[in-house]
Amino acid sequence: MMTATLIRFEQIGKNYAQQAAVTDFSLNVKRGEIFVLVGASGSGKTTIIRMINGLVKPTTGNIYFDGRKIETYNLRTLRFQIGYVLQQIALFPNMSVAQNVALIPSMKRTDKSKINRLVDQLLTDVNLEPHVYRNRMPDELSGGEKQRVGILRVFAAQPKVVLMDEPFSALDPISRTQLQKLVLTIHRKLRSTIIFVTHDMDEALKLGDRIGVMRSGSLLQVGTPQEIVQHPNDPFVRQLFEKSMSHDVYAVYLNKLDVLGYLQPMPDQYKGPELAQEQTVREAFTAFVSADQLAIRTKDHHLQLLTREKLYQFVSDYRNH
């Protein structure tokens, strides 16, 4: 029988040459959620996710994957169940787009017709038309297209969990936003479990179903974006969020208005514009030129109401922060 928890950390510690990298780390990661670990460089985030696929062994404590201790798995069997996305996604240059995406399913001897359908569906989902992109080689792709294909390759394997270690930190803001949307789109369709590592609280709030804040190898707080923002239990957690508020107010994603409580329940009867949580305050102001209210589609795919008054209040509060 499947349990709600896919990965469980029990009092994990990791030392390097008598120096503690991780201390007393305990956490349950639920099936089907995007769990984001956020913290500064050196806080232990990458060490934690490397323990999941056996690249790093804990000094103390136990890790359970799908109900079994990690150490009891054959390493190859374990890693076939785990996808890994790093900053630099390298496609095989002598393989077409379709061959790159189909790599792991082919290694698993999945039926070819099923693989072909999967490849076409995934390409379609990320706005890469199969008949145009299937047979293209990596050197015929733009940088953003290569990133999308690399991410599809990981999800095509249908792993039980996908580990994403600062995958977008080296990208320009436009590419970064596009790939964040891609992750949310794929997650909505496949309901994969994702553990995402970042140092950017904005990114954490945008992507995470739950967020874990780390500092100096310790887990300070775990909660939903709303819980982290509205009820920080540590000065460092509060400071981390406040730093994410220092940017151009018009470039703020609408999901931040959700986590801060500026959105309201939808009325029974609503006819008007709809924006996605990945859109910005600037886009909301543009939409308000012809409307008094907006529907905002949140990450869980529910609609919430944004009024003109609440948007003005947010901008005022933001500038006075």
Q: Which residue ranges define each predicted feature?
A:
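Conserved ABC ATPase signature
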Residues: 137-141, 145
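Conserved catalytic motifs of ABC-family nucleotide-binding domains
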Residues: 158
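Conserved ABC transporter NBD signature motif
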Residues: 61-69, 78
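Conserved ABC ATPase "signature" C-loop
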Residues: 216-217
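Helix-to-loop junction immediately C-terminal to a conserved catalytic motif
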Residues: 53
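Conserved ABC ATPase "signature" region
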Residues: 113-132
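ABC ATPase "signature
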Residues: 222-223, 231
